[in-house]
Amino acid sequence: GRQFFGTGFPFLTFSNVFNNWFLPKQLESLVQTTDKERESCSIKAGDVFITRTSETMDELGMSSVALRDYPNATYNGFTKRLRPITDRVYPRYIGYYLRTPKFRGQFMAFSTMTTRASLANNDLLNMEVELPPMEIQHRIATILSRYDSLIEN
């Protein structure tokens, strides 16, 4: 319940994921969590978070990528964590790629709509991700990061 929120350890909210291609530098929300929860729901550099439920289909599957470790932090239950098990994924590249219309279109094909849009775990596992060689991923991410910096400043 609500009594667990407001104090404790950093907490990744649904809106943190929904509104940011990359996790914010600081997670402002706090929640009381156990050692076990902090271990099983940890946030490490390279982790990809995807919103798995939403009010509408077009808001489903929004992603955000952790560019650093967040010690003692946990994430919300309406978000799915994907932890790449390969060194073939450059976090900045995947952060941009997962927000492209081409990739996001796959969510529409897999999602189901009852009263809320939702994604099943198996659907996420069946989605295709284009991974060019690491050097190309770095170049793409660097170019897009520079544009982001120009837009923000």
Q: How would you name each of these model-derived features?
A:
Residues 1-13, 120, 130:
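Extended boundary segments
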Residues 32-35, 80-84, 125-131:
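Short, well-ordered beta-strand elements within core beta-sheets of diverse protein domains
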Residues 53, 101-102, 147-152:
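A generic secondary-structure signal for well-formed alpha-helical elements
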